[in-house]
Swiss-Prot record:
One of its GO terms (molecular function) is calcium-dependent phospholipase A2 activity. PROSITE patterns: PA2_ASP, PA2_HIS. Its cofactor is Ca(2+). GO terms for biological process: arachidonate secretion; lipid catabolic process; negative regulation of T cell proliferation; phospholipid metabolic process. It comes from Porthidium ophryomegas. This is Basic phospholipase A2. The lineage of its organism: Eukaryota, Metazoa, Chordata, Craniata, Vertebrata.
Length: 121
């Protein structure tokens, strides 16, 4: 769920997720349209696509089983919740892997600037 996703992002990036990612670019946060602005925004686009493929549970609110030490390990018997966990894990790792190209100009980015045709998942 969103609270667990926040913890994963914080663990992987050492950044406060709400500040750094909740309103970043065209796809981070609620909704999304246009073309991703950079690699970090693409992480959010791919995460949105991943959530679209989830069936059988609500990705944003259902709790899943996972552990975090040096890496994130998704567990539990519920295949839907495990899939959500894997979506969140992939995005958190993607954010970490793209920290060097993170652009502050895309923080709190007004989505009315996201006018390019939207990409398909």
């Amino acid at each position: 769920n969103l609270f667990q996703f926040r913890k994963m992002i914080k663990k992987m990036t050492k950044k406060e997720p709400v500040v750094y990612y909740a309103f970043y670019g065209c796809y981070c946060g609620k909704g999304g349209r246009g073309k991703p602005k950079d690699a970090t925004d693409r992480c959010c686009f791919v995460h949105d696509c991943c959530y679209e493929k989830v069936t059988g549970c609500n990705p944003k609110w259902g709790y899943y089983t996972y552990s975090m030490n040096k890496q994130i390990v998704c567990g539990g018997d519920d295949p839907c919740k495990k899939q959500v966990c894997e979506c969140d894990k992939a995005a958190a790792i993607c954010f970490r892997d793209n920290l060097k190209t993170y652009k502050k100009k895309y923080m709190s980015f007004p989505n009315f600037f996201c006018t390019d045709p939207s990409e398909k998942c």
